[in-house]
Curated annotation (Swiss-Prot):
Keyword Lipid metabolism: yes
Gene: fadA
Organism: Aeromonas hydrophila subsp. hydrophila (strain ATCC 7966 / DSM 30187 / BCRC 13018 / CCUG 14551 / JCM 1027 / KCTC 2358 / NCIMB 9240 / NCTC 8049)
Name this protein carries in UniProt: 3-ketoacyl-CoA thiolase
Primary residence: cytoplasm
Root EC class: transferase
């Protein structure tokens, strides 16, 4: 099989979904901006050589409907003969897009792909039009479709306290703010125009979602939001609602070499796994274990991890059962995570992978894992190796 390499990876700033920077910017525009930008950053690449575009998006309706991948590609001026398809594995959609492109390259069905994803949660809410089949209640707990309650369940099963959740969430904001101030996100963010609070046009090249003032003390004052009587999960310990997109240029190693493009990493292994929908946030554990087995690696071999922070109550059990609790500050989400940056559903897989690759370069790390939970009980993971 052909080796699959990542040549480039970028993302938009993360905008707040409620009246945020991108309230007047459509999801197709966020996507097209990155498609154009990744080509501008790699002038050796002839766009006519692109085989296909795989683009993750969860809520495929309204402006995100009718194959947003193709709509964005047309807006971006991608040659008309290049295909584009929208991919949906809920929270893992853009990582699934990466996996799909990687497999196509491995079996010889193309050498050059753009992958990524988008979600404008301000324009298309997560629950818009959702209508679960009532018969699912025969085999799946009714609350399984309510992500916050699945986090409550997972946290209770693993004895995760409110204090632990508040500390983890404060850490996310603290580290994300430090990464912003120190310019560590500059290599991955491709800024674009939005609107400030007054409605004036403003060029955003930073994440609007981060709240640097967040502390354990302020978080401790928030009430549980999903289970007000007995719960511990608050809005502050949940991933923020945000708008954003991320993209990667994925190629066969041979074609990258022929074009004189320097790979940043290669795909070492990929995996998805299922788990009980009632504890959907546990998915990263079996997915990561499966990916590592395929790569012939152990947890101890991995230098850095990016674990999508859907909830603190969900992340901490995964950290514990992956055996990472003693190395969190050395290996896990060193630039914060979705609690601070937000979790635009279709974007997040490519976003955490992009952040991971930049951290691996910064830390001169060799091996990294990006993994995330997926609604209704799945996990997805990718093992990257720097080249």
């Amino acid at each position: 099989m052909k080796d699959v390499v990542i040549v480039d990876c970028i993302r938009t700033p993360m905008g707040r979904s409620k009246g945020g920077a991108f309230r007047n910017v459509r999801a197709e525009d966020l996507s097209a901006h990155l498609m154009k930008s990744i080509l501008l950053r790699n002038p050796n690449l002839d766009p006519n050589e692109i085989e296909d575009i795989y683009w993750g998006c969860v809520q495929q309706t309204l402006e995100q409907g009718f194959n947003i991948a193709r709509n964005a590609a047309l807006l971006a001026g991608i040659p008309k003969q290049v295909g584009a398809v929208t991919v949906n594995r809920l929270c893992g959609s853009s990582m699934q897009a990466l996996h799909d492109a990687s497999r196509a390259i491995q079996v010889g069905d193309g050498d050059i792909f753009i992958i990524g994803g988008v979600e404008h949660m301000g324009h298309v809410p997560m629950s818009h039009g959702v209508d679960f089949h009532p018969g699912m209640a025969k085999s799946v707990a009714k609350a399984s479709g309510m992500m916050g309650l699945t986090a409550e369940m997972l946290g209770k099963l693993h004895g995760i306290s409110r204090q632990q959740q508040d500390e983890f969430a404060a850490r996310s904001h603290r580290r994300a703010h430090a990464a912003t101030v120190e310019g560590r996100f500059a290599k991955e963010i491709v800024g674009l125009e939005g609107h400030d609070a007054s409605g004036a046009r403003f060029f955003y090249d930073y994440d609007e979602v981060i709240r640097p003032e967040t502390t354990v003390e302020t978080l401790s004052q928030l009430r549980p939001v999903f289970d007000p009587v007995n719960g511990t999960v608050t809005a502050g310990t949940s991933s923020a609602l945000s708008d954003g997109a991320a993209a990667m240029l994925v190629m066969s190693a041979d074609r990258a070499k022929a074009l004189g493009l320097t790979p940043r990493a290669k795909i070492r292994a990929m995996a998805v796994a299922g788990c009980d929908a009632a504890i959907m946030g546990y998915g990263p554990v079996p997915a990561t274990q499966k990916a590592l087995k395929r790569a012939g690696l152990t947890i101890g071999d991995i230098d850095l991890f990016e674990l999508n922070e859907a909830f603190a109550a969900q992340s901490l059990p995964c950290v514990k059962d992956l055996g990472l609790q003693d190395v969190v500050d050395e290996k896990v989400n060193l630039n914060g995570g979705a609690i601070a940056l937000g979790h635009p559903l279709g974007c997040s897989g490519a976003r955490i992978s992009t952040t991971l690759l930049n951290l691996m370069e910064e830390k001169d790390a060799t091996l990294g894992v990006a993994t995330m939970c997926i609604g209704l009980g799945q996990g997805i993971a990718t093992v990257f190796e720097r080249v």
